[in-house]
């Protein structure tokens, strides 16, 4: 089995000082992306949504949305509140009991692409995010198919 390269913790768009968090417009834009992502998943990828904690049938739990929001803010180079509250993300460990194959990876990426579209994220930052999300989604696969 070929081991996938481990993604870097905080992505950088260039050698400049701006982080993806800054380029996206900060906290409110990132949290809007998270809401659009989970809304798209609930609407378009119900099998993937069902792998998450639910508040009601078909509704991904607020705690999951909030936790991913904190994680994404930090991962994009913003405040490290996730680390302060939850420790190191340890993505593979935290997702280890969730069956993630190619179908789940692709459903996750479709949900994120829909959210990025809905939030109007375009240009170089979009290309960068598409690439980085694909790398991380593939890294988290723990099933062959």
Q: Positions of the model-derived regions?
A:
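Core of compact, soluble alpha-helical bundle domains
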Residues: 3-145
